């Protein structure tokens, strides 16, 4: 029999998943029902919550499995707040749940500290790369998040849709305020994903051309998920976000988990494909762009963008755009991506 203490802790967990997680509490009962019995929930650990419809239906075999994550960088607060509100509305019954759902708050210790990360960028430690930094405080969390995603998708109905939406905000401004990054899988992007991104009013999509170590790369490659990383605006402290700026993406996530149909004939995002990157060779790296240059700023052929000892990066296409320029990364890491517009050919090849 559930005690009143268990019930109060469950209410606190579900009513404000963010606040509950920041306290470091663990619920005395780790599973239960909510939404007037319509939803089952299970607490899987710090910042990890699974929810699914309680009623067994014939449609269960086609029920989608959706992982929605935020806070992989601990200071990217707006998506974390949106995800906590999503849990609240599902638990209260204000929003129906039509899928298996795994909610993930990523780097919880960094969230508590108000930092991007403590030792290492968590979003570069997936697909086993955490084994290279065993002393990092982020390494155990990467291991835990990989295991949680793998177990969640392993239990998915065969043939049913699998999604992973990883929500972030960016350090710097962007020519396209809200954009998405799709992991490289060796297959053309899907029209299903592009139409969902269009419904979310995502202005641009960046296509990776090599495997990476991000959370969405992991779930796409190892779990077979339709996965994307969303960049939804600027980093701000908890409580200082204008969440109305995130409304289209929030609505699209809510449609996905509630089984609602997206808007028809939405404009598809522009598409940019990675053609090179600036890799920091040493602490002597010079990036010849303004410190506050916006993501997707364009540069003409012949422009020298970086120099590091004998290494120099010069624009070789008529126009290249820089994304995520960051000269302060550790040597050996990416200090910027270079992309070109490939909208026409990408949209023509959608599957």
From Swiss-Prot:
Organism: Burkholderia lata (strain ATCC 17760 / DSM 23089 / LMG 22485 / NCIMB 9086 / R18194 / 383)
Class of enzymatic activity (EC top level): hydrolase
Domain of life of the source: Bacteria
Keywords: Arginine metabolism, Hydrolase, Metal-binding, Zinc
Keyword check for Metal-binding: yes
Name used for this protein in its record: Succinylglutamate desuccinylase
Gene: astE
HAMAP family, per the entry: Arg_catab_AstE
EC number: 3.5.1.96
Pathway this chain belongs to: Amino-acid degradation; L-arginine degradation via AST pathway; L-glutamate and succinate from L-arginine: step 5/5
Protein role: Transforms N(2)-succinylglutamate into succinate and glutamate.
